């Protein structure tokens, strides 16, 4: 298996390469290119130019540049013969880029090659528990712990909450600072718009939520509004502010007609907070899918009675193994779904970008 990367930044170093080492026993053939000549990663052979990378015999190409350059890289990649092109989230970064991307994907032969990736779309535990098809990889808290089908129809779900509340640290002035999601070290980047929580991490929650609802029989209907949005110091984002990144936001709306609340926070304190979904059922029970340390945690909550399962491993490793690479990949098991999956990710990014316009004003 031959893999290529356009962009050799932090997400490749801290997420992709560790995940590939976890999945495969033997090293893969990886090649890559980055505009910054000093960027070299162990295990990735650097190509002298992007043209040479795209001419290489690559099975799957990952577009892992900064989000503003995803579309330019994708356009060049589509001119190559590489059969599978996976674009990191968000698939594009501006509303004007969305129109260009839609034009590219209007060609069926191009749409069949391009998969817009959000690794949270692999977090399907809540759906599995709801349908009574929990993967044996989920480890029960108690021996002989079982749960049959929990949800028989979509109208049994009365509300969904989505969360991504990341742990944070403090700088010398006592102000909150973001932490790298993979290493836990302080994030030295100066986060600016559009890299606030609405686009940067809202994409994760929305992808997980929509894939779950879709698998339970939902449709593509989607609407959201911004209830609150503040910077890392808790100050409201002002109309006309095109510089300050949102540090925290509350979004509210409907997915397939179900009321939803999405809680996003990049500065949730040293312990962080919830990272996943809570499905509230009409009989009072709750299906909770969370993340704790290096494990996903699934719970069926019925008052004081809680059944719990855990799934160890990095989310990226599960996503690459179950959706992107090998015989289980979406390209292999359901090639017709590749374009539809990309369309859903594009719809989500477009809506979130429009929320930014409403929050800050046209830009």
State where each predicted segment sits.
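N-terminal Rossmann-like dinucleotide-binding module
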Residues: 1-43
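A structural signal for well-ordered alpha-helical segments within the folded catalytic domains
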Residues: 14, 71, 99, 124-128, ...
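Local beta-strand N-terminus motif with an aromatic residue
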Residues: 29, 58-61, 157
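C-terminal helix-rich "cap/oligomerization" subdomain common to oxidoreductases
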Residues: 32, 60-62, 110, 217, ...
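Beta-loop-alpha module in the N-terminal Rossmann-like domain of NAD(P)-dependent dehydrogenases
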Residues: 42-107, 123-133
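A contiguous active-site-proximal alpha/beta segment in oxidoreductase catalytic domains
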Residues: 92-176
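Rossmann-like dinucleotide-binding domain that binds NAD(P)(H)
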Residues: 181-259, 265-271, 343, 347-350
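NAD(P)-dinucleotide binding in Rossmann-like oxidoreductases
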Residues: 239-322
């Amino acid at each position: 298996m031959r893999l290529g990367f356009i962009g050799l930044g932090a997400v490749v170093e801290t997420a992709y390469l560790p995940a590939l080492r976890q999945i495969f026993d033997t090293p893969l053939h990886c090649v890559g290119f980055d505009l910054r000549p000093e960027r070299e990663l162990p295990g990735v052979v650097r190509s002298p130019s992007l043209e040479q990378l795209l001419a290489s015999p690559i099975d799957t190409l990952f577009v892992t540049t900064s989000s503003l350059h995803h579309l330019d890289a994708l356009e060049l990649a589509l001119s190559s013969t590489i059969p599978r092109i996976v674009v990191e989230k968000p698939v594009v970064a501006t509303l004007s880029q969305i129109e260009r991307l839609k034009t590219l994907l209007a060609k069926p032969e191009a749409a069949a090659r391009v998969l817009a990736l959000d690794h949270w779309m692999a977090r399907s535990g809540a759906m599995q528990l709801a349908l009574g098809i929990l993967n044996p990889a989920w480890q029960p808290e108690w021996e002989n712990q079982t749960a049959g089908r929990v949800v028989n129809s979509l109208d049994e779900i009365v509300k969904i909450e989505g969360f991504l509340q990341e742990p944070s640290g403090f700088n010398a002035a006592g102000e909150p600072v973001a932490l790298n999601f993979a290493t836990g070290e302080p994030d030295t980047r100066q986060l600016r718009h559009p890299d606030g929580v609405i686009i940067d991490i809202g994409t994760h929650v929305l992808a997980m939520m929509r894939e779950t609802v879709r698998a339970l029989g939902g449709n593509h209907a989607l609407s959201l509004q911004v209830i609150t949005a503040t910077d890392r110091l808790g100050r409201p984002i002002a109309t006309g502010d095109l510089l300050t990144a949102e540090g925290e936001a509350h979004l509210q709306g409907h997915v397939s007609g179900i009321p939803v609340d999405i809680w996003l926070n990049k500065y949730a304190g040293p312990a962080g907070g919830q990272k996943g979904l809570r499905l509230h059922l009409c009989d009072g029970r709750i299906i909770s899918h969370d993340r704790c340390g290096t494990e996903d945690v699934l719970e069926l909550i019925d008052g004081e009675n809680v059944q719990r399962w855990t799934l160890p491993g990095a989310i990226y490793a599960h996503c690459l193994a179950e959706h992107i690479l090998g015989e289980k990949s979406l390209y292999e098991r359901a090639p017709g779904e590749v374009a539809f999956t990309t369309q859903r990710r594009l719809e989500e990014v477009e809506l979130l970008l429009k929320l930014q316009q409403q929050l800050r004003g046209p830009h």
